[in-house]
């Protein structure tokens, strides 16, 4: 499917908890179905199917929560939160046709590895983890799924995950409710009360060479990334995805790292930088010039400009975007020459030779393929 919008019909709509609903999507054209890796997401353009609901279409991203072994259908599971998700919950019904891109995303289970896996999720962050559990079920690879949420009412997929774990000694699940009731603990709806702690992880995880995957809100990510680092897990063994402003999680582990502004990105990410072009590199006042090659425009950057996305829009251009926070990758654009710095570290680095406009500023004169 790649970057093309394709039509997918809502075949089923099922509540998973008080706040999360699943949408089962089937392609209008069966040739549009593509296999996906556990952890990937779909991009949806919402509003096109219901012109009365939104003043303009919204672009949103939802992790695939179903089994990657299933063919001809996708499942996304959406928390009722924010305009796009509320639109899905309230307006989209079985039979409606949605515009979809994907699957895509680099936050995926390493299925070539044989190391034991720790899956840590908070709230709706469990959606990619459920897909990973489906992928791990037939493999015999050891996996510990530890999920934290507020209470039984908002806990999605409990029965589905329990069914995967049952009869498979290599799979383990542990649920932590912040507001656990005595009956939740008694009937096995959850196993611990409060928050995930270092002591809890030490009690659940035998000493081993783990790979960890984290997904959840920023506070959850920061706390649990720090716990894993404290327990000795190398940062290279921790993959993460969350839905919020991009954050350097290593800071939560009190690890000294160079600030984003000190990490320039070159046009080709090469060890040897190309010589700077001499003519017309700066405008009056010493400000760098930003060139838009495709549009045949060039303008001087000013100290008041926040990022290259805002700058391009102010120049009358319409680059693709969605999150404006370094998370989604929609604004990735080819950097033809020059260097940029990131004011906020992207959640996932763009492809080689590309730059995320929404969180980048020019270090000097730059040329963009826009």
What are these regions (language model features)?
Residues 281-324:
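C-terminal accessory/binding modules appended to enzymatic or scaffolding proteins
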Residues 367-370:
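Short hydrophobic/aromatic patches at helix-to-coil boundaries
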Residues 229, 345-349, 357-359:
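Short proline/glycine-enriched turn/loop segments at secondary-structure junctions
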Residues 1-97, 149-151, 162, 178-180:
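Ferredoxin-reductase
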